[in-house]
Amino acid sequence: MSRIGVAFDQARAEGRAVLVGCMPAGFPTVEGSIAAMTAMVEAGVDVIEVEIPYSDPVMDGPVIQRASDVALAGGVRVADTLRIVEAVAATGAPVVTMTYWNPVEQYGVDAFARDLAAAGGTGLITPDLIPDEAQEWLAASDAYGLDRTFLVSPSSTDARLHMTVEQCRGFVYATTIMGVTGARAQASAAAPVLVSRVRAVTDLPVGVGLGIGTGEQASTASSFADGVIVGSALIRRLLDAPNLPAGLTALRELSAELAAGVRTPAP
């Protein structure tokens, strides 16, 4: 079982969901992103999702786009992301990478899988790659023992959902709000329905994302999902801060609030 699987099992034994915190690699700098992700772990985030910044992020909302633009302007590369993965994995928290597919193709699919595994990464979330076009990635992830997480949404047909989760390993990512990422005032009412649909066809844990930004929302999501995935709300704490130390303080505060939320599932 992967480290992600262990984290989900431990959380399930505690009667709660796993908290997954997301941050772009190299934002605000390479060292700054390592400090940010480490702070998140220290404040109670269970799993870190490191996003490889990309110039055409079709699914990312304005907050993640702004942070990714900062990272790209700073010259961050895939090699920097792997160094960040290695540093954050040293905290003991499982680290999964999220990337659009083009950077992996440019790097080389087999080489990327090899180097991600060597850095201590547990697997990859691929928002714009579907299983029926992922033969090379399926082979590479098998070869290097990496989890692979594909996305399902409320619009997924039953046939598409079944085919997608069949190729997942580690957990399934349920995008519970249609559209781009970003914290919402209210979590999607479609989320519990989508989680139930996924659970009907797989025993894999289900993580919900897109729209969660408060401890209350995390508590609600923890009552029906196995994982609560938060990105934009955490990133905004760094974007809105006057400097990195202030940003890290704000990041710790929100991470602790979210961690408390998943540990007290709503009835």
Curated annotation (Swiss-Prot):
This is Tryptophan synthase alpha chain. It is an enzyme of class 4 (lyase). It catalyses: (1S,2R)-1-C-(indol-3-yl)glycerol 3-phosphate + L-serine = D-glyceraldehyde 3-phosphate + L-tryptophan + H2O. GO terms for molecular function: tryptophan synthase activity. Belongs to the TrpA family. It comes from the Bacteria. It holds the Pfam family Trp_syntA. Tetramer of two alpha and two beta chains. The lineage of its organism: Bacteria, Bacillati, Actinomycetota, Actinomycetes, Micromonosporales. The alpha subunit is responsible for the aldol cleavage of indoleglycerol phosphate to indole and glyceraldehyde 3-phosphate. It comes from Salinispora tropica (strain ATCC BAA-916 / DSM 44818 / JCM 13857 / NBRC 105044 / CNB-440). The active site is at E49 (proton acceptor), D60 (proton acceptor). Its EC number is 4.2.1.20. SUPFAM superfamilies: Ribulose-phoshate binding barrel (SSF51366). InterPro entries: Aldolase_TIM, RibuloseP-bd_barrel, Trp_synthase_suA. Pathway: Amino-acid biosynthesis; L-tryptophan biosynthesis; L-tryptophan from chorismate: step 5/5.
